[in-house]
Amino acid sequence: ASGMDRRRFLKAGTLGALVSGAARASDAGAADRGNRVQRYRRLGRTGFEVSDISFGSSRLRRGEEHLVHMALDRGINYFDGADSYTGGASETVLGNALKGRRDQVYLVSKTKSWAGTRRSELDAALNASLRRLRTDYVDVYLNHAVNDVERLANPEWGEFVERAKAAGKIRATGMSGHAGHLVACLDHAIDHDLADVVLVAYNFGQDPAFYEQFTRGFDYVAKQPDLPRVLEKARQNDVGVVTMKTLMGA
């Protein structure tokens, strides 16, 4: 009887281990699925179906191609860069990492066009980014960190965009911003049909009631209670909206 009990005990123990192992494997699988992109959404009038989480590259440094590959493997297909990020190294890393996979992603770059910037300067900036990115076009090219309507009103930017689109170097354009005059700049860009896509800072702090809880000054990103209105206007005009600083980070 004791031998039978021992066999039953061992059998039950083995079965329990198998069940426990299967449960852990199931949990690991669920965790892995949870670390992947959950859905893709249309980016406004561009028609691009982009991942619900994008890859920002402002701190991407040489030798970090593996981070780009990790993002690709998890379903991210929207990669955001700029000519100023890590002195151009960020775009170089993106270009290296996306070699052979360019047609699987949407690639974004940005440059700063000022009120007095000439088209020739913008052409040079775009071409330099294309070389670093190892591609002949970008899907989205943005006027970077705009906080002055005069930067958007510069006719050289509009002419540059028109010519670059015609040449197939840019598919969509717009602006990015996160400073004090963001709403005025967005209003101007949308009202004058200067943006297919906008990249804006947006987070829980946009709710004015949130700030009423505090007596000190807070994050410069969010003191713009009119931002929800202008983002709704963007939606009505089919302008794609991408958000950044969603956790109020830098």
Report each predicted region and the residues it spans.
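Distinct, well-ordered alpha-helical segments
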Residues: 68, 91-99, 119-130, 150-159, ...
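Beta/alpha (TIM)-barrel catalytic core signal, keyed to glycine-rich beta->alpha loops juxtaposed to Asp/Glu
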Residues: 7, 146-250
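C-terminal segment of N-terminal export signals and the immediately downstream linker at the start
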Residues: 23-53
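Conserved, mostly hydrophobic/aromatic
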Residues: 43, 55, 79, 94, ...
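Acidic-and-aromatic substrate-binding clefts and catalytic sites of carbohydrate-active enzymes
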Residues: 60-63, 82-91, 114-120, 147-153, ...
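N-terminal secretory signal peptides and thylakoid transit peptides that target proteins
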Residues: 1-17
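Active-site groove signature of glycoside hydrolases
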Residues: 133-149
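Alpha-helix-loop-beta-strand connector modules within alpha/beta enzyme cores
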Residues: 95-108, 163, 167, 236
